[in-house]
């Protein structure tokens, strides 16, 4: 009997799974809000220099006489005249600049508060020479996500999924709330970094805890559900940001609910699969019997005993004798190959995704409308992705999503700027494909890595995604060399990464691997084709040690039938 059979015995997809999955994925509604929150809290309204304090604005011309014009006839945002230019025809916008001397905005700025009454940009004057600080805040948030993926992925394999989730909810609640009351920009950035760390842990452990409690045939459904909840969060952000335009109120509104998530997360049940892989058979039995009671299978739960579990989960128990580490991803040839291929997929998906979604003001239309459209396209995209994942498999779904996204972005690079409808449509389509790619890569990664290193592998994958999200804004600077250069780069990377999927095995209908031995035995044909399967007599010392204490996988009848 394998672990999947034990899950079926205690109720399969019963009341417990329905309740826990719902409660675990609910915080993802607000995780989407945090990831793109600065599109609204750091929006840049129209602005221009404030005249000197002693300026007489009651005379004919008023404010206009202090503002030079750019080539489009609009007031300069970062310059003002050193003295009023009374004789120049600024009011009709025909004079481009004038001959007066100019200076920076030494007395501050006047902002158009009609759309964005209050943002971190207007509060701390993050414009002109300080404009880069706005991007710094988002980059530091992504650095936090990067650190969180590494730290909490590792801790989840050591301490368990439940404990780390509880900590992450509390950290998000506290740091997000403190960011809303930050007295200055450096403190705001520090708390945003801490929020990013915690949200990375929530993202990783949400997927893993749910997948490890679900039977094989429902894992794709869970992955797709998580993706849809994240997409709904994008709708939620557009509505909430429109209703609450003040950045401090908005920051608080998307952070305070995590206090409630922290409270109810104490009732989560830790993954029995993680308990067994850690060698804690007593806790495995207790968790399974508790789930059986919740699912109305008390009698089936009573049939379980320590002896039954020892016979059924001998492999997980022997696994507990060897502690996997992040270095295992590089020592073992099979895991190293997985790590390198999956890292490329994670990086490419995140790199192109954030290249599109973090420049909403660049579309020239309502930022709230674009946010809704970007959220709406996820729904059909992820539905199609789900159908492909469940019918054709994870590998073709991942390849198609990245390839189509890259093609859409590349086409945008050659379409003229005045074709705004076509360009926007392609960007939306590309964003939908990248959202489907994220959905697939989360599920695919969790199914490829063995149990004892699964969360570490997920954490390293998410780490590479955060590297992509940090590098992505830097690529936008290449537009100074050639306007379409960023789009060519954003498109070429996912197209190239899509080819990597042919080097990975298919996981559709397969039980989760618990050891490296499981992975190698199922992946032998793919490894041989790729030329990475270790030849006889060439095993490393680490692999030989694994063979001493790992028993072969004995698939149950249900698993052999893909159930």
Swiss-Prot record:
Q: Domain of life of the organism in this record?
A: Eukaryota
Spans within the Cytoplasmic topological domain = 1-9, 157-164, 214-224, 270-337, 390-395, 447-455, 506-563
* A molecular function GO annotation: identical protein binding
Locations listed in the record: Basolateral cell membrane; Basal cell membrane
Q: How is it modified after translation?
A: Glycosylated. Glycosylation at Asn-113 may occur at a secondary level. Glycosylation is necessary for proper targeting of the transporter to the plasma membrane.
Mutating residue 293 to W leads to what result?
A: Increase in substrate affinity
User: Site described as Important for interaction with cidofovir, positions?
Assistant: 230
Pfam families per the UniProt record, alphabetical: Sugar_tr (PF00083)
Effect of substituting residue 230 to A:
Loss of membrane protein expression and little uptake of cidofovir
Q: Which UniProt keywords apply?
A: Cell membrane, Glycoprotein, Membrane, Transmembrane, Transmembrane helix
Positions in the Extracellular compartment? 31-135, 188-190, 246-248, 359-368, 417-425, 476-484
Q: How does it sit in the membrane?
A: Multi-pass membrane protein
- Stated consequence of mutating residue 30 to A: Complete loss of PAH transport activity
Q: Which BP terms does GO give this entry? A: alpha-ketoglutarate transport; metanephric proximal tubule development; monoatomic anion transport; organic anion transport; prostaglandin transport; renal tubular secretion; sodium-independent organic anion transport
Species name for this entry?
Answer: Homo sapiens
Q: What else is known?
A: Involved in the renal transport of a variety of drugs with well-known nephrotoxic potential, therefore may play a role in the etiology of the drug-associated nephrotoxicity. Uptakes the diagnostic agent PAH/para-aminohippurate and clinically used drugs. Mediates the pH- and chloride-dependent bidirectional transport of PAH/para-aminohippurate in exchange for 2-oxoglutarate or glutarate as counteranions. Can also mediate PAH/cGMP exchange.
Q: Which InterPro entries match?
A: MFS_dom, MFS_sugar_transport-like, MFS_trans_sf, Orgcat_transp/SVOP
The residues that the database entry marks as glycosylated are: 39, 56, 92, 97, 113
Please describe what this protein does: Secondary active transporter that functions as a Na(+)-independent organic anion (OA)/dicarboxylate antiporter where the uptake of one molecule of OA into the cell is coupled with an efflux of one molecule of intracellular dicarboxylate such as 2-oxoglutarate or glutarate. Mediates the uptake of OA across the basolateral side of proximal tubule epithelial cells, thereby contributing to the renal elimination of endogenous OA from the systemic circulation into the urine.
| GO-annotated cellular components | basal plasma membrane; basolateral plasma membrane; caveola; extracellular exosome; plasma membrane; protein-containing complex
**Assigned protein family:** Belongs to the major facilitator (TC 2.A.1) superfamily. Organic cation transporter (TC 2.A.1.19) family.
Q: What is this protein called?
A: Solute carrier family 22 member 6
According to UniProt, residues marked as the site described as Important for interaction with cidofovir and PAH are 438
Sequence intervals crossing the membrane: 10-30, 136-156, 165-187, 191-213, 225-245, 249-269, 338-358, 369-389, 396-416, 426-446, 456-475, 485-505
């Amino acid at each position: 009997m394998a672990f999947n059979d034990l899950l079926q015995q205690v109720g399969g997809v019963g009341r417990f799974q329905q309740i826990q999955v719902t409660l675990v994925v609910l915080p993802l509604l607000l995780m989407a809000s945090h990831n793109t929150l600065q599109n609204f809290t750091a929006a840049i309204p129209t602005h221009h220099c404030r005249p000197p304090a002693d300026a007489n604005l009651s005379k004919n011309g008023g404010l206009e006489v202090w503002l030079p014009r750019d080539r489009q006839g609009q007031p300069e945002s970062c310059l003002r005249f050193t003295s009023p230019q009374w004789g120049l025809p600024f009011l009709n916008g025909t004079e481009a600049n004038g001959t007066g001397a100019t200076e920076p905005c030494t007395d501050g700025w006047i902002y158009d508060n009609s759309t964005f009454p209050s943002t971190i940009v207007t509060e701390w004057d993050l414009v002109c020479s300080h404009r880069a600080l706005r991007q710094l805040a988002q980059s530091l948030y992504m650095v936090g996500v990067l650190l969180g993926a590494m730290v909490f992925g590792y801790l989840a394999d050591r301490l368990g999924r439940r404990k780390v989730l509880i900590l992450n909810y509390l950290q998000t609640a506290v740091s997000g709330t403190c960011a809303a009351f930050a007295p200055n920009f450096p403190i705001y950035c520090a708390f945003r970094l801490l929020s990013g760390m915690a949200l990375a842990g929530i993202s990783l452990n949400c997927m893993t805890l749910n997948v490890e409690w679900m039977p094989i045939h429902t894992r794709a459904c869970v992955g797709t559900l998580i993706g849809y909840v994240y997409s709904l969060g994008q709708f939620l952000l557009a509505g909430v940001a429109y209703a609450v335009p003040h950045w401090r109120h908005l920051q608080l509104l998307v952070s305070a609910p995590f206090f409630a998530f922290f409270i109810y997360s104490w009732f989560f049940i830790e993954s029995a699969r993680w308990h067994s892989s850690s060698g804690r058979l007593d806790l495995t039995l207790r968790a399974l019997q508790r789930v059986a009671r919740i699912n109305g299978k008390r009698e089936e739960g009573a049939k379980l005993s320590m002896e039954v579990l020892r016979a059924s989960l001998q492999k997980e128990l022997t696994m507990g004798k060897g502690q996997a580490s992040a270095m295992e991803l590089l020592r073992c040839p099979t895991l190293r190959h997985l790590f390198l291929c999956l890292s490329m997929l994670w990086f490419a998906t995140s790199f192109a995704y954030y290249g599109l979604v973090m420049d909403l003001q660049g579309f020239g239309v309502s930022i709230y409308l674009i946010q809704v459209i970007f959220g709406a396209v996820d729904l059909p995209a992820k539905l199609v992705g789900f159908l492909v994942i469940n019918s054709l498999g994870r590998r073709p779904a991942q390849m198609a999503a990245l390839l189509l996204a890259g093609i859409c972005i590349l086409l945008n690079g050659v379409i003229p700027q005045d074709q705004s409808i076509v360009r926007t449509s392609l960007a939306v389509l590309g964003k939908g494909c990248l959202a489907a790619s994220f959905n697939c890569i989360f599920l695919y990664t969790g199914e490829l890595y063995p149990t004892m290193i699964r969360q570490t592998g997920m954490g390293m994958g998410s780490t590479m995604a955060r590297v992509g999200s940090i590098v992505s804004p830097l690529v936008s600077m290449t537009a100074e060399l050639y306007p379409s250069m960023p789009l060519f780069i954003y498109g070429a990377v996912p197209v190239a990464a899509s080819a990597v999927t042919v080097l990975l095995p298919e996981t559709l209908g397969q039980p989760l691997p618990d050891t490296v031995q499981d992975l190698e035995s199922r992946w032998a044909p793919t490894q041989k084709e790729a030329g990475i399967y270790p030849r006889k007599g060439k095993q490393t010392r680490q692999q030989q040690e694994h063979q001493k204490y790992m028993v072969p996988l004995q698939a149950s009848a249900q698993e052999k039938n893909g159930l």
